Amino acid sequence: MDTYQPPIFELSQPGKHGTNLPALDVPEVEFPAALLRQDDLNDFVELTEPEVMRHYTRISQRNYCIDTGFYPLGSCTMKFNGKLHEEVARYVGFATAHPLQGDALSQGALRIMAELQRDLAEISGFDEVSLQPAAGAQGEFTGILAFRAYHLDRSDHDRVEVLVPDAAHGTNPATAAMAGLKVVEVKSDRRGNVDMDDLRGKLSHRTAGMMLTNPNTLGLFEDEIVEICDIVHGAGGLMYGDGANFNAILGIAKPGKLGFDFMHYNLHKTFTTPHGGGGPGSGAVGCTAALAPFLPGPRVRERSGEAFADPTQSQQPTSAADASPLQYELFTPEKSIGRMKAFHGNFGMLVRAWTYIRTLGEVGLREVSETAVLNANYIRVKLADLYPQAIDRICMHESVLKGQIVGAPKDIRTIDIAKRLIDYGFHPPTVYFPLIVPEALMIEPTETESKPTLDSFIAAMRDIAREAVETPELLREAPTSAPVRRLDEVRAARQPILRYNAEAFAKLRAGE
């Protein structure tokens, strides 16, 4: 059976249509030329409704997602998203709320936001939280802008450098550069942690702060984190916590108590709001009281001791005693860096995170991290004899192995292992990250996977290691069972075709 599904543009046939319109029984109206499309409609698709439906249904059946299988992407926390959270987010009062309907008609939504702010602050050990940033990278940008505003507010104009570990997520240096600051790289030591001597040597009166992920991108806990924070603070800098790996320490360690001044939470990772496919996400941020005046607004706070007019009621309260005990309003901090996003963040994601926290409670959140760490170490230990470890020590929520299989030909690489996993029915782990590890395989199983699932993945990885030694051509040719064989990823990156073009597609098929 031919598994190829051509682009919908190539299925089009002139004269086909999905809807029959009634005969025109009103006068024709001529639209002004300025309102009419000027380019041609050569690529306008003409198909029947069943053909359109079948095309997209076939494509959807090829999707791989967390609802269909194990998704061990390192540094992505692809945990299963509970469906209760989806149900709550779809409540009509939340799903149909409009950000311009005003505080009085948004009390339920504002209460959700206020309680989530409080919960995230408690879980992380920070004083204040803003829910506005739309994703982790935007949360980072928020934090570094707040750092810059904090230093400028103190007339400390020399602090223009941000320290970033060599194992950091790529968004860290990009964030600092976008904020107009200089990036200074800090080396890792042989244990995979920050090299303390290198850190001390790069601190100066120009240091605005340091960005650090803990656990780091090697999946290892920075066990000298308190000293790192003390050293940076001693030099007048601030500590930014990249919360990408927060799933490893819920209920175990609080970044705000360890010495961090600011951190973003990836609600779409740690707090099980769906992610992948472009969003939406949520990069809520927490900070110390000293940085709270610079948070983006508006934020939510509880009103107390005053009457609140409700336009839906004919009888209005005349005193605070008559008012509802739970009343919330939006406000902007006095020295706010301004909005990071229109309105109030991705509200549906906030509802899901709020539900997740209440579903699990304090004990459940700690169990999340304990199980995530256990699962990651189980995989690490079961594969370490065939796939060398990047750093030979206990990991946290994810492990980093090398695709340099013991006994395999030298030309068998991580990309071959990843492609072969597709033939075994698994989504590949993250590959070639962190950049400081040659042939890196970053595996994050999360807490929602069962031992039988982990054992199946381990068995597949061990089978692939055997194939790499005995029949390496299987890896070189993989995937063989997917609808599309191995892609030319270099060409795709260098010559992207981002919209359909018949001529370009014809050249691709001809191998040009």
Language model: regions and residue ranges:
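Non-catalytic terminal extensions of PLP-dependent enzymes
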Residues: 1-127, 145, 253, 303, ...
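Short, flexible loop/turn elements at secondary-structure junctions
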Residues: 77, 135, 168, 216, ...
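A short, small-residue-rich loop immediately preceding and capping a beta-strand
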Residues: 127-133, 161-164
